């Protein structure tokens, strides 16, 4: 079974629980190709008593028709934005949404004759989901640290975006993934470090996942869907022969073939794995 939960993730989860009261807004990034699997219930347990903004990143790579079916369940928990963090329009939309949330805080404070400080926003999500990309885009190269904030260590860097402050956090996975399907889904979007796993095991689980959810991805390069490990490697060997992925002596380079297939799988567009 594919699993990966290094010690620093457990530590980050503990620290979030301890500092929950410090944050005004939880910005939770999700992968639009994994609208269910990229949701970490451990993070939601910490965030669910505060305002939440869900941002589905990589909306440009998902299936536009299917993703909309998942949105209503998230709208029950918070605000939702579909985005491509490399697109300026998406960043403007996110910035506008955060500023609108600030206005709600400000309106409440005005009734109490109180000034509204910048919102303290923490950005959360599984690894490689785009947290740093979002911070860089919203900050627009402003990387100055702000002053000390109670409950936060000096080593943690807040980015000042005028009406709000942003705090990045390490990517956090679920302590137990629960099934090979989940591990394969996270591996195919690079949220699990494949180089820390057995590459043969990874390719088998991803191949099975695609055979189950998106067999057209395999058929596009003349691979037959299969759930049998022996047959899967037979298909990979044939793929290597067809594409002349060989070592000296006309021997199949299995490792290179697997890496090329993984790269192909990761770059597929118009897809949902959940």
Q: What do these predicted ranges mean?
A:
Residues 128, 133, 143, 154, ...:
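Short, flexible micro-motifs
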Residues 90, 130, 165:
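Short phosphate-engaging motifs
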Residues 1-2, 135-146:
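Conserved P-loop NTPase mechanochemical-coupling segment
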Residues 93-97, 137, 205:
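Alpha-helical scaffold elements adjacent to nucleotide-binding pockets in ATP/GTP-utilizing enzyme cores
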Residues 119-140, 169:
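Glycine-rich phosphate-binding P-loop
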Residues 1-26, 32-34, 39-41, 46-53, ...:
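Helix-rich effector regions associated with P-loop NTPase G domains
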Residues 53, 60-125, 143, 246:
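Canonical P-loop GTPase G-domain recognition
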């Amino acid at each position: 079974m594919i699993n990966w939960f290094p010690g620093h993730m457990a530590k980050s989860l503990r620290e979030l629980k301890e500092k929950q009261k410090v944050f005004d807004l939880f910005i939770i990034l999700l992968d639009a190709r994994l609208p269910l699997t990229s949701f970490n219930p451990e993070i939601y347990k910490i965030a669910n008593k505060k305002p939440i903004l869900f941002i589905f990143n990589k909306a440009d790579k998902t299936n536009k028709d299917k993703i909309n079916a998942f949105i209503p369940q998230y709208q029950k928990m918070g605000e939702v934005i579909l985005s491509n963090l490399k697109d300026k329009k998406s960043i403007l939309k996110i910035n506008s949404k955060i500023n609108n949330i600030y206005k709600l805080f400000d309106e409440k404070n005005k009734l109490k004759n109180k000034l509204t400080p910048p919102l303290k926003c923490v950005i959360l999500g599984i690894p490689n989901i785009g947290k740093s990309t979002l911070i860089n885009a919203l900050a627009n190269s402003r990387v100055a640290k702000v002053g000390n904030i109670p409950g936060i260590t000096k080593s943690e860097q807040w980015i000042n975006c005028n009406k709000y402050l942003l705090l990045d956090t390490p990517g956090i996975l679920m302590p137990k993934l629960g099934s090979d399907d989940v591990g394969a889904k996270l591996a195919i979007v690079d949220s699990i470090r494949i180089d820390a796993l057995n590459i043969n095991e990874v390719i088998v689980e991803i191949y099975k996942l695609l055979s189950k959810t998106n067999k057209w991805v395999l058929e596009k390069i003349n691979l037959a869907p299969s759930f049998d490990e022996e047959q899967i490697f037979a298909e990979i060997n044939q793929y290597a022969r067809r594409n002349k992925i060989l070592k000296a002596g006309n021997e199949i380079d299995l490792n290179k073939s697997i890496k090329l297939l993984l790269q192909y799988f990761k770059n597929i567009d118009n897809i949902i794995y959940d």
